[in-house]
Amino acid sequence: MRCLGIDYGTRRIGLAYGDELGVATPLPALVEADPAKRWQSLLATARQRRVTDLVVGHPLNMDDTAGPKAKEAEAVAARLRTELAGVDVHLVDERLTSYEAEATISKTQRRAVRASGVIDSRAATLILQDFLDQRFPPPLPHPAE
């Protein structure tokens, strides 16, 4: 299993990679200005890494409804299913992952870091790690004898 985590945005696409070891690692975000080039870079990354699973962040509202961003993520997932046939595409609840990722960066650095896509890739890492943790839960400790 080779997974690519995706935090899809209108200006940047955060990426993370993980496998059966169960550890998500951030990759450089896709920050091309042209959305078509960003999309092609996403497809190229998935092909180069020979991923078996794509994990797309699904930004549901706090009341579990799907707003415009969630519907956009659903459309992205559907397009990925079409363009990368044979790759499983999963939508994973990503509520507050961008805020959590941003909280790890000092306030003075956030503007520069946001433009570089670091926050987006950290969010993708959190999304993918959640998926991997569900797939590969840590073993329970052995009972003391």
From Swiss-Prot:
GO biological process: rRNA 5'-end processing
SUPFAM superfamilies assigned to the protein according to its UniProt record, in alphabetical order: Ribonuclease H-like
A Pfam family of this chain: RuvX
Membrane-crossing residue ranges in chain numbering: none
A GO term, aspect molecular function: nuclease activity
Localisation: Cytoplasm
Keyword set, alphabetical order: Cytoplasm, Hydrolase, Nuclease, Ribosome biogenesis
UniProt GO cellular component terms: cytosol
Enzyme superclass (EC): hydrolase
EC number: 3.1.-.-
Role noted for this protein: Could be a nuclease involved in processing of the 5'-end of pre-16S rRNA.
NCBIfam families: RNAse_H_YqgF (TIGR00250)
Family designation: Belongs to the YqgF nuclease family.
UniProt-recorded name of the protein: Putative pre-16S rRNA nuclease
Species annotation: Opitutus terrae (strain DSM 11246 / JCM 15787 / PB90-1)
Lineage: Bacteria, Pseudomonadati, Verrucomicrobiota, Opitutia, Opitutales
